[in-house]
Amino acid sequence: MAAHGGSAASSALKGLIQQFTAITGASESVGKHMLEACNNNLEMAVTMFLDGGGIAEEPSTSSASVSTVRPHTEEEVRAPIPQKQEILVEPEPLFGVRQEQELRNGGAIDKKLTTLADLFRPPIDLMHKGSFETAKECGQMQNKWLMINIQNVQDFACQCLNRDVWSNEAVKNIIREHFIFWQVYHDSEEGQRYIQFYKLGDFPYVSILDPRTGQKLVEWHQLDVSSFLDQVTGFLGEHGQLDGLSSSPPKKCARSESLIDASEDSQLEAAIRASLQETHFDSAQAKQDSRSDEESESELFSGSEEFISVCGSDEEEEVENLAKSRKSPHKDLGHRKEENRRPLTEPPARTEPGTATNHQGLPSMDSEVLEMSPEKSDGIVEGIDVNGPKAQLMLRYPDGKREQITLPEQAKLLALVKHVQSKGYPNERFELLTNFPRRKLSHLDYDITLQEAGLCPQETVFVQERN
């Protein structure tokens, strides 16, 4: 019975050896050793053989003896960990709990949530969407002051204006009623141009400008809701509503070419035409020198009853000249045209009558600069300290001529208008304007000083025919 069991075990071992050799291609002796080492476990023996890269066909006797002993000493060695594939992190659901709740509630929660972007968002509903020039034009059309806010994204106080001040309903109401609100970033092109012109240094920055002249009236840096309302209320109490152009847009009409927009060639042509006209009227001017000298002492200004004294004539002569001008306006207009050409070509100092006609015949070029004599300027700014600070003004006339005059800073703007009118450019037909910033001086109050009008210490003033 025992012999029958031993033969069955040996036949089973032979079968395992044959399977091992068929799988691995090794010899029967190698298969026998591997099966003995693995306790007749065919799978483990094949794995061990393949992992070891194969074993020699006939191992030495010493290795054989070691292998024969190994089953007794290493029977407790555990099997290798089988290979398997698993996912370390399970995929998250496509929507979170909050998103699923919002979908179920129809987005009601999203309306209640206020993000940081909403808190610090600029006041789009208040802002003027355009450039600085269009904001000024809009302020003139709507008779509203121009409020400027320069934003620096690196300054948190500027962001607080968006969060606390501009979002307040009381602030919004007062801005909508009285101001054109223009906000721009400091590093933008418009912001850099504004900073360079108005010399901005501190942030946050809020200022109020007159849209007609571009003059800065007030400037604030630290504001909250209460202080802003107090400051704006005080400003409106002091300056009131802006009195400017009517809210109705002006009718478009054919506009003549202005002196500023004209090229040098066109200005030179205008000067040559004026010179030819002067030569043509030389004979008429020589006959009427005495009379035109008397009438040039005074001029009517803008339809008012005032007289503009240039050379200090007495009141009786002024009343007599006024009566003459009222009786024959067409004749007086002809005299004015003839008189106006003569002072532009005369030298600053008064000359003899015989030499005055010679100067009248000189051609007038664009490069000619006429300086105003102290005697004439004293007559215009009578009653003002002429020894104080001066304003250097370069006047450019429509005929291409230029005149440089010096007036005290405290002289009224009316004095400048009178001087231009004495040169033959009445206020009814001509206006004064500056180029940068482009503004019309004829729209300002004539009682303000040259310093308040922004013409100090020096400025170029253009005389242009009204449209």
Swiss-Prot record:
SMART domains given in the database record: UAS, UBX
Primary location: nucleus
Localization terms from the record: Nucleus
Xref: Gene3D superfamilies: DNA helicase RuvA subunit, C-terminal domain, Glutaredoxin, Phosphatidylinositol 3-kinase Catalytic Subunit, Chain A, domain 1
Ubiquitin-interacting motif (UIM) repeat placement: 263-282
Highest rank taxon of the organism: Eukaryota
Positions of the UniProt region annotated as Disordered: 57-77, 240-260, 281-364
Covalent crosslink: Glycyl lysine isopeptide (Lys-Gly) (interchain with G-Cter in SUMO2): 84, 112
Polar residues biased stretches: 59-70
Keyword set, alphabetical order: Acetylation, Isopeptide bond, Nucleus, Phosphoprotein, Ubl conjugation
Residue span, UBA domain: 2-54
Domain UBX: 386-463
Basic and acidic residues composition-biased segments: 330-344
Cross-referenced Pfam families: Thioredoxin_7, UBA_8, UBX
Modification type N-acetylalanine: residues: 2
UniProt keyword Ion transport, yes or no: no
GO cellular component, as recorded: nucleus
Free-text comment on this protein's domains from its UniProt entry: The UIM (ubiquitin-interacting motif) is required to engage the NEDD8 modification on cullins. The UBX domain mediates interaction with VCP/p97.
Annotated function: Ubiquitin-binding adapter that links a subset of NEDD8-associated cullin ring ligases (CRLs) to the segregase VCP/p97, to regulate turnover of their ubiquitination substrates.
Assembly notes: Interacts with neddylated CUL2, ubiquitinated HIF1A, and VCP/p97.
Protein name: UBX domain-containing protein 7
